[in-house]
Design a protein with these regions (language model features):
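Conserved, single-site charged/polar hotspot
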Residues: 1-234
């Protein structure tokens, strides 16, 4: 495990539709408890707290619209549902017109992104050590995906679904946020190379080696198959 340099690093997250069904939206509805600012080209509009803004691709006067809170409050996208809840986002929302559809990119500090990942990937009531380990794993995974840049056609680095790491499926949690803060900047490396920290929710107790599942002939030494055993004699 290594400590990354202190830099104000950000990540760009492509937000999918309800049920993570599609990468592009028919319309986008945004609101916030506090005032927020909408910028389209040279024009700028201020929306009051509680006001809902509805944007459709056909109505967009610019190819890109950016939305940010005037008071660093979270932005809710009411046109998206995650389970029974409406997700809320830190940072900036960037809406990009693509024909009759809209792409939504949430740009925010990477550490704050992890606040939205941890409780979506691991129950926040798990032990502190487990949450800290997951925070390091999630940070390393995000950094690796930024390097891979597989979503460059969307001008994003990850999306919010299981294709990457689930993000904002569950609300932020104080315990999970603390685990992120306690491990700030820590990533997993193999030698001087950032490691690929794949993880999964369900296991039968046996993992397999990387060359069997990652569609590559290159063996990754630290991703070797293991039998996971637990002593339950006590």
């Amino acid at each position: 495990v290594e400590q990354k340099e202190e830099t104000p690093e950000t990540i760009r997250v492509l937000l999918t539709t309800t049920d993570f069904a599609e990468k592009e939206h028919d319309e986008v509805k945004v609101r916030s408890e506090k005032p927020f600012v909408v910028k389209a080209g040279e024009s700028e509009k201020r929306c009051e707290g509680g006001e809902e803004l509805c944007i459709r691709a056909v109505d967009m006067s610019a190819e890109t619209i950016t939305i940010h809170s005037a008071e660093e409050a979270k932005l809710e996208i009411t046109s998206i549902k995650r389970g029974e809840r409406i997700p809320s986002y830190r940072g900036t929302l960037e809406l990009k017109k693509n024909g009759k559809k809209i792409r939504i990119i949430n740009e925010l500090p990477l550490e704050q992104y992890l606040y939205g990942v941890l409780p979506s990937e691991m129950p926040a009531e798990y032990p502190e050590a487990a949450l800290r380990a997951q925070a390091v794993c999630a940070r390393s995974y995000a950094e690796k995906q930024k390097q891979n840049n597989r979503l460059k056609e969307y001008d994003a680095q990850v999306d919010d679904s299981v294709a990457y790491q689930v993000y904002q499926s569950q609300p932020e949690d104080e315990r999970a946020n603390k685990a992120v803060d306690d491990t700030k900047g820590l990533v997993v490396c193999s030698g001087n190379i950032l490691a690929s920290t794949y993880f999964f929710a369900t296991s039968c107790g046996v993992t397999t080696s990387s060359d069997s599942v990652l569609f590559t002939n290159k063996e990754i030494s630290y991703l070797a198959g293991q039998v996971q055993s637990t002593d339950i004699s006590d």
